[in-house]
Regions:
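Short alpha-helical transmembrane segments in multi-pass integral membrane proteins
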Residues: 1-23, 81-146, 190-246, 302-367, ...
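Residue-level signal for short hydrophobic patches within transmembrane helices
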Residues: 12, 16-35, 39, 62-69, ...
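Helix-terminus/linker motif at the lipid-water interface of multi-pass membrane proteins
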Residues: 35-54, 123-130, 186-193, 253-286, ...
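Small-residue-rich hydrophobic transmembrane alpha-helices
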Residues: 53-113, 150-169, 276-334, 338-340, ...
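Hydrophobic alpha-helical transmembrane segments in multi-pass membrane proteins
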Residues: 22, 26-34, 71, 103-112, ...
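Short runs within selected transmembrane alpha-helices of multi-pass transporters and secretion channels
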Residues: 74, 143-161, 169-180, 198-213, ...
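Transmembrane helical elements of multi-pass membrane transporters/channels
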Residues: 21-40, 142, 176, 205-209, ...
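Hydrophobic transmembrane alpha-helices of multi-pass small-molecule transporters
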Residues: 65-68, 180-185, 210-214, 286-289, ...
Length: 448
């Protein structure tokens, strides 16, 4: 199949260089998405104070809980589209695209209503302090108004990734990211809108990225061209999207529930610790983007090669992804550890907030490469269409360990250090289970 200048041929030629070409724009795209939240945090931390910083930061885990089920389902669309595109099945590819975009629109509207109705209740359930809950609820409600744009962008970008195009989503996010940063400065510094201002800026930037990705799909002149008149759900392909996407979404949602539980434990230390965790958690986000971009590459490459029955090439994809992920995440983790104080000063000038952030970083950044290894094997399995068992193992290993830690160990040794040691402990246990699962599934594929 003829490739356009943005696409990558995942099924032929060398692998390592193509993985890097695929992953690097995806990594930069993820960083830009994080910059939406990072700019929010930096601007409110510098110009609106520690309470506003804590208010914005305390919403992160909750927003992820609400949205990650549907974002996980977009992985199902990515896997199915990659498989059809590699096999040259144009009609099936078109039906998948229109089903995915329709699903994104519906889920975005549903999430907007859910966020507007349940934001404050969920924040109260997490024990958000009275001095920040009003601002937190306001930020969440405005943020969720932009959920249809957020969903449409993510599902559209998933289709582009399926055909090997990670460059145009990066361009779209550069444009919307610049708009976000400029609007933050205008609305917060000039108009003193505080958390409402940064939320409005984020929604507008999401609208712009949504328009750009939809325009790209509508003008593509390929099997993945989008026609608004054809928007409808094909139940056959919706079922296949759900088979891969729902377990991935449930896994992400449940893991973020455990993070929300951890956030509630941090809340018990007060707004200073909350602000420190907010800044540290944003740094975690940048580390996760590095490992997640490689996982996305592994899933897309595996799916296309699985679609054309190049099983030995799938193994080489996994090995090369492991090398890239470990080297990248270990290097970045060490950088975050050794330069943690300087990085945290970008977010806040409060020395107590910086101290709390450093305590959290000291136990989580260097071993972050374990998180990368933990995510790669489920990514490869999803690329082969196996999503249920990896989801169960991730929930048991990651969430189970953290729940036992929070309720069994933390109450007897109340400190941020003890709380966050649960991260590397859960990663190690999950790796053991996921590698074992991959070994048995891969043996079955080899026999096919």
């Amino acid at each position: 199949m003829k490739q356009n200048k943005y696409e990558i041929d995942m099924c032929n030629g060398t692998i390592m260089d193509k993985l890097i070409s695929f992953s690097l724009p995806l990594m930069l795209s993820g960083i830009l998405q994080l910059m939406f939240n990072a700019v929010d945090i930096i601007v409110v931390g510098r110009f609106s104070g520690s309470q506003a910083l804590a208010a914005v930061g305390s919403t992160t885990a909750l927003i992820n809980v609400f949205t990650n089920l549907f974002i996980g389902i977009s992985l199902g669309a990515n896997v199915l589209a990659a498989r059809f595109y590699a096999a040259g099945k144009d009609l099936e590819m078109s039906d998948t695209v229109h089903t995915a975009v329709t699903l994104a629109l519906v889920s975005g509207i549903v999430m907007a209503f859910v966020g507007l109705i349940f934001s404050r209740w969920a924040l109260e359930l997490m024990g958000t302090p009275d001095d920040v809950i009003g601002q937190s609820a306001l930020y969440m409600k405005i943020y969720f108004l932009g959920m249809p744009f957020f969903m449409l962008y993510n599902y559209g970008a998933a289709i582009l990734r399926a055909v090997g195009d990670t460059k145009r989503p990066l361009i779209f996010l550069v444009i919307s990211g610049v708009v976000n940063a400029v609007l933050n400065l205008i609305l917060v510094i000039m108009f003193h809108m505080d958390v409402a201002g940064v939320a409005i800026a984020t929604v507008i930037s999401q609208l712009i990225s949504c328009i750009l990705v939809l325009r790209c799909l509508c003008t593509s002149k390929t099997s993945y061209q989008l026609h608004f008149g054809k928007l409808r759900i094909n139940t056959v392909y919706l079922k296949q999207i759900f088979q891969v996407g729902i377990p991935a979404g449930i896994q992400s949602t449940v893991i973020n529930l455990s993070n929300a539980l951890l956030q509630s434990s941090v809340n018990s230390f007060g707004s200073t610790a909350m602000a420190g965790y907010t800044a540290a958690n944003n740094i975690f986000g940048f580390l996760y983007v590095a490992v997640n971009s490689v996982t996305q590459a592994c899933m897309s490459f595996t799916s296309q090669n699985y679609g054309v029955h190049k099983f030995k090439r799938m193994d080489k994809v996994l090995v090369d992804c492991l090398i890239i992920s470990v080297v990248t995440s270990f290097s970045l983790g060490c950088g975050a550890y050794f330069f943690g104080s300087e990085i945290l000063k970008i977010y806040t000038a409060d020395p107590e907030v910086i101290r709390c952030g450093l305590e959290i970083l000291s136990y989580t950044t260097v071993p972050y490469f374990l998180c990368g290894i933990m995510d790669l094997f489920p990514g490869a399995l999803r690329g082969m269409g196996h999503s249920g068992v990896p989801m169960i193992l991730s929930v048991i290993g990651t969430v189970g360990t953290r729940i036992v830690w929070i309720f069994g160990i933390f109450p007897h040794h109340r400190s941020l250090a003890v709380l966050f040691i649960s991260y590397p402990a859960s990663w190690m246990l999950t790796i053991i289970m996921q590698v074992t699962c991959f070994y048995f599934v891969r043996r079955k594929v080899h026999r096919v």
